[in-house]
Amino acid sequence: MADTTVEKLASEVGKSADRLVEQFSEAGIKKSKADTVSESEKQQLLEFLKKQHGGESAPTKMTLQRKSVSTLSVGSGSASKDVKVEVRKKRTFVKRDPAADAEAEAAAKAEAEVKAAEEAASKAKADAEAKAKAEAKAKADAEAKEKAKASAAEKAKPVAVTAEEKAAQDEADKLQAAKDTAAKAKADEEAKAAAEIARKLAEENSARWAEEEKQRKESEKTGDHHVTTSTEARAAEDTADANAEKRGRRPRKATPAPAAAPANTGKGKRRGGKDNRRDSRNARGGRNARNNRSVAPESMDHAFTKPVAAVKTDVSIGETVSVSELASKMSIKATEIIKQMMKMGSMVTINQVLDQETAQLVAEEMGHKVVLTRENELEHQVLADRDANIQAESRAPVVTIMGHVDHGKTSLLDYIRRAKVASGEAGGITQHIGAYHVETDNGMITFLDTPGHAAFTAMRARGAQATDIVILVVAADDGVMPQTIEAIQHAKAGGVPLIVAVNKIDKPEADPERVKSELSQHGVMSEDWGGNNMFVHVSAKSGEGIDELLEGILLEAEVLELKAIKEGMAAGVVVESKLDKGRGPVATVLVQEGTLKQGDIVLCGLEYGKVRAMRDENGRAIKEAGPSIPVEILGLSGVPSAGDEATVVRDERKAREVALYRQGKFRDVKLARQQKSKLENMFANMVEGEVQELNIILKADVQGSLEAIADSLNKLSTDEVKVNIIARGVGGLTETDASLAAASNAIMIGFNIRADAQARKVIDAESVDLRYYSVIYHLIDEVRNAMSGLLAPEFKQVILGLAEVRDVFKSPKIGAIAGCMVTEGTIKRSAPIRVLRENVVIYEGELESLRRFKDDVADVRNGMECGIGVKNYNDVRVGDQIEVFETIEIARSLEE
């Protein structure tokens, strides 16, 4: 491991560098901030800090005593006798000192060095002796050979040895002896040096070695049989020993061999040898030999290693997923997701359902790759099983009429249809989407009439989505209004061509040029001014310009080249739906492709069913409907939402499965969105007092009106009063609705519907507030007034009069009487007062007496003198002012 500096070490341990330098200095190590620190210096500092903070005060030795009692049967003649045998065991656990371990390691190292030196010396000495012996043997062999040669030569040719040859031989012998002596002396010197080194090491370490030998013998006497110093390993060994003793045998460990058992004497010799026979049988591999296997763990290391980096995975997320499921997919704990979402501003629980968008944000924030999946493959298969290879044909255009309220949209359509429709709408305004188709000389046109009131924004948006052409009706005498601008925005958002019908052109105050100018400010330019939008001047009253408008619609449709599949399975969109008491759920469907036939299986949003009956916009029964034809269908399982897609499928069972799946998913997604409790909203709700709630049960005739009213009522909510729609639905008011209203103290609102007989009984018995409406204006106004009554009242103090104290008199009954002159307003006896001294309020109370001359009076007007007695206050002085006031309540309204 690379050495680190003092400054880096200080940052790692969370201390200041100066403090760490001081601690090194106290431990006897001189360091500066830039110096490097080795591992040995770190260990030295750690041991110093442990000693300084009492780290060695922990017990180093613990002795446990164990006692067991067993019964031994001893034979005595023909009878046997049971003898209780008590076995006492004593075991001492020693915590080894790291310092002692280090010293023992150093001693072992030194001893090894001494042994190595001794071995080297003995080896050198042995080598020298072996070399000397070898040389002596070689010399003897050489001499023997020379003698043999000489004798042979003498035998062959006896020659007298001269004196010179003998002298040379003697000289060679002397040189060889000198070499042998020098080699032997050198070997002796090396052996003496090695012995001297060993002697010095022995003298230096003899005391320490004696102490270590003494400690070792004591440790063996105490019976510490642990093989390892690890705390966990020791505990495992103890557990293994206890289990072994329960099974009636000793564990096999690295312990000395047991001493031979003493021979049994006396009559119990055979009986007493029973245990020995069992032990010998176990040793031979008998029945209990399996239990003699060592159970002490060899290592306490775990196989798991902590990952060095976070694992990034591909997370597949469906439409909804719970927090626990998302955590499982990301291989993390659910608490990590909860923490992350709290950082993002949302509080969730482990079982809470998240929508797909939220789960995607969380997963991407935590570094994972998200794969969005569609869980319902059945739905995909059912909708994909359509008629193929069918040629598209021309179809009639679908035209939506939009505009501001009372600009004549329905009257214009009424003239086109030659029927009075506007008179049938409550208040003369359209509150539903009306779908009609009209046959002209040049072809068929389907019209959708949308409401113009501000509350019907969603209905107008649906009309723009399902349409091919938008006719924007603008009154020539009124100009561009808010809903006119909104209709332009809907048309632009849907990418639908716009035709402007300037209505009421027959009025004297009509100003079509003003309409063109105002519309040009919103991006609608007339063809006369170089734009792309057709402007037609019409009059719904006289019929002026109607033919030109129809021709313009058909011309625009021809340019668009509208086509659709005429034959095959139908598909369309729900433009309106309602619950009819006699017919059940009724949906108005605009067929967009294919042919819808009676008996078809229709999957419509969250609902499904077989088409039992079909009716056109005039109420006539029909058997089939082609593209661009609006039709009412009966037979659905429930009331679908306006805007849902209606699709004909082949199998009713599969349609039911898809509808149930959609309902479950819709419920989960709705719950996931409702449960989002953001932190900022939590803190915003922590205010003093409670928010007043107006509970409402809302029922309407059609789905579109229900949505519009609910949205308008929710917009009335303020910080002090909140509209709480506890139940809503399409159809008449039932007994269940009345019971719920009574239990929740809610008001019941019916829009174009009535309560049945059972509901009226509950309403009368419980005195439930029931209100019927047919015009949305009146409904919203009355709810606003009801909410105004729930607002906390405001109080205001009004000063009635002011009197100046001119003199002070004493009365035996009342006390101090102030003689005053009324300078402003009127002094009333019943009103509360304040006493002012130098324009500072010093007392607030009420009058006890008000007199003019000697008579008690109720009030005294401006400019008159009077006597005033203040109740429970006698410190009235000349120059004080007495102010009379009253508190009035100010009514509040939501328009404030």
Swiss-Prot record:
What molecular function terms (GO) are annotated for this protein? GTP binding; GTPase activity; guanosine tetraphosphate binding; translation initiation factor activity
CDD domains associated with the record: IF2_eIF5B, IF2_mtIF2_II, mtIF2_IVc
Name this polypeptide is given = Translation initiation factor IF-2
Q: Where is the composition biased (Low complexity)?
A: 254-266, 283-294
Q: Where is the composition biased (Basic and acidic residues)?
A: 117-227, 273-282
Ranges of Polar residues composition bias in the record: 60-79
Chain spans, region Disordered: 53-81, 117-301
- Free-text function comment from the UniProt entry: One of the essential components for the initiation of protein synthesis. Protects formylmethionyl-tRNA from spontaneous hydrolysis and promotes its binding to the 30S ribosomal subunits. Also involved in the hydrolysis of GTP during the formation of the 70S ribosomal complex.
Gene Ontology annotations for the cellular component aspect, listed alphabetically: cytosol
What gene makes this protein? infB
Q: Which UniProt keywords apply?
A: Cytoplasm, GTP-binding, Initiation factor, Nucleotide-binding, Protein biosynthesis
Q: According to the UniProt record, where is the region G4?
A: 503-506
Please give the superkingdom of this protein's source. Answer: Bacteria
User: Which family is this sequence assigned to?
Assistant: Belongs to the TRAFAC class translation factor GTPase superfamily. Classic translation factor GTPase family. IF-2 subfamily.
What segment(s) does the record annotate as region G2? 428-432
Per the record's keyword annotation, is Cytoplasm included, yes or no? yes
Which residues constitute the signal peptide according to the record? none
* Keyword Disulfide bond attributed: no
Note down the stretches annotated as region G5: 539-541
Give the region (G3) as residue ranges.
449-452
Q: Where in the cell is it found?
A: Cytoplasm
> Locate the tr-type G domain: which residues?
394-563
According to the UniProt record, where is the region G1? Answer: 403-410
- Organism (species): Shewanella sediminis (strain HAW-EB3)
Provide the binding site for GTP: 403-410, 449-453, 503-506
